[in-house]
């Protein structure tokens, strides 16, 4: 979040009080994000020493620190076990519901997509197969043909 600070290494000493207050505000915001994503207990550990699912949540936290209006998530649960997948799905829903941040999710685990998405776009080699609500997509015969080889 340092890019959000209005004082830098040169101007900081000239505006010491203001720079210090800004730093405190940014630190509090980062702590809020860590609490929101259940990361507060991991603050003193090197990221590389943490479990994979926690590392992915830290990545989401870094993105949230930028105060986005749209959060782009490219396969956020790839390589995760079931518990990590469920935790991540919970946090994605929290981000949407509690923070009001729109999310664009690219994911191949269709059960997760159906649980998280309001709208789904199905692509086949870059071509749009279907767009609609999860229930519509599940009933779409073309989607079944593309993804299940014609079985429905």
Model-predicted regions and their roles:
Residues 1-152:
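Glycine-rich phosphate-binding loops of nucleotide-dependent enzymes
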């Amino acid at each position: 979040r340092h890019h959000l600070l209005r004082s830098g290494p040169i101007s900081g000493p000239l505006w010491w009080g203001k720079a210090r207050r800004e730093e405190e505000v940014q630190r509090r915001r980062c702590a809020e994000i860590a609490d929101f994503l259940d990361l507060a207990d991991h603050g003193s550990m090197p990221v590389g020493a943490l479990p994979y699912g926690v590392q992915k949540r830290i990545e989401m936290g870094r993105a949230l620190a930028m105060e986005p209006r749209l959060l782009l998530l490219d396969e956020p649960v790839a390589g995760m076990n079931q518990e990590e997948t469920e935790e991540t799905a919970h946090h994605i829903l929290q981000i949407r519901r509690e923070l009001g941040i729109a999310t664009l999710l690219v994911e191949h685990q269709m059960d997760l997509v159906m649980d998280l998405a309001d709208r789904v776009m199905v692509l086949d080699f870059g071509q749009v197969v279907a767009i609609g609500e999860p229930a519509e997509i599940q009933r779409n015969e073309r989607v079944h043909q593309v993804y299940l080889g014609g079985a429905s």
